[in-house]
Design a protein with these regions (language model features):
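Glycine- and acidic-residue-biased ligand/ion/polar-headgroup-sensing regions
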Residues: 50-62, 67
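Ligand-binding loop in jelly-roll beta-barrel domains
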Residues: 83-108
Length: 110
């Protein structure tokens, strides 16, 4: 396994609807993923059965809803969504980017 992530050498994977991601790195217990959104793109509300998630805003801003609590988050802010907690986002600016951390790793992303 390569222990380094080189952003410029890693292409985005287009997910559709104005959302793209890059896998930064992973172990069986942890995964880091950059997720970039076009303005107005929606991270549809959902919950994870088997994963805890921390999402940190790297750039831009998001309207977030975690467990029914709504906030606008900007670069440097984050939210925690323990497993089974509904959460979703709407990008308020073009290029808004999250660094998602999952535990354990998301096998469905590999």
């Amino acid at each position: 396994m390569n222990p380094y992530f080189l952003n410029d050498a890693t292409p985005w994977t287009e997910l559709g609807d104005g959302i793209r991601r890059k896998i930064v790195g992973h172990t069986p217990e942890l995964m880091s993923v950059l997720v970039q959104f076009d303005q107005g793109a929606i991270g549809t509300p959902h919950a994870h059965d088997a994963h805890d998630q921390i999402a940190m805003v790297i750039s831009g801003s998001f309207a977030c809803d975690v467990g029914g609590v709504k906030r606008v988050l900007r670069a440097g802010d984050a939210f925690v969504a323990p497993r089974l907690t509904p959460h979703g986002v709407v990008a308020l600016e073009a290029g808004s980017t999250l660094l998602d951390q999952f535990s354990p790793r998301r096998e469905d992303y590999l």
